[in-house]
């Protein structure tokens, strides 16, 4: 399998996971007794997860797919993963990783422009 195709497939799997998480957020998590802040965190993490999964689908068309794909994937894990974790557990200890994840997402978009 060509290296570029891996990123397209990863984007598709990530998108499927984002839709699954969104369904849980809309039907399970939102109906729970969690406070509004945690619900907003979950929604934000899910929104960024989904949008950047779509970006991964374009990575095979970049000049540097390994760089762009690695940055976007790492950014999704650190940014959205941190928000998902805090929203589900209530534990804010990993929150400090979110800005690093956001920075990786920005760099991933920039790498797509190279």
UniProtKB/Swiss-Prot annotation:
Keywords: Cell membrane, Membrane, Signal, Transmembrane, Transmembrane helix. InterPro entries: DUF423. Residues 86-93 are cytoplasmic. It comes from Bufo gargarizans. Belongs to the TMEM256 family. Residues 1-25 form the signal peptide. It is a multi-pass membrane protein. It is found in: Cell membrane. This is Transmembrane protein 256 homolog. One of its GO terms (cellular component) is plasma membrane. Residues 26-64 are extracellular. The keyword tRNA-binding does not apply. The keyword Signal applies. Pfam families: DUF423 (PF04241). The chain crosses the membrane at residues 65-85, 94-114. It comes from the Eukaryota. Coiled coil: none annotated.
């Amino acid at each position: 399998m060509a290296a570029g195709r891996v990123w397209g497939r990863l984007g598709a799997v990530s998108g499927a996971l984002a839709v699954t998480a969104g369904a849980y957020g809309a039907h399970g998590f939102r109906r729970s007794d969690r406070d509004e802040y945690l619900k907003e965190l979950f929604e934000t993490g899910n929104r960024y997860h989904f949008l950047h999964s779509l970006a991964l689908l374009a990575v095979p068309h970049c000049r540097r797919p390994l760089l762009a794909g690695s940055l976007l994937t790492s950014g999704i894990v650190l940014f959205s993963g941190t928000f998902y974790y805090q929203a589900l557990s209530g534990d804010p200890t990993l929150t400090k990783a979110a800005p690093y994840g956001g920075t990786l997402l920005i760099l991933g978009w920039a790498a797509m422009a190279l």
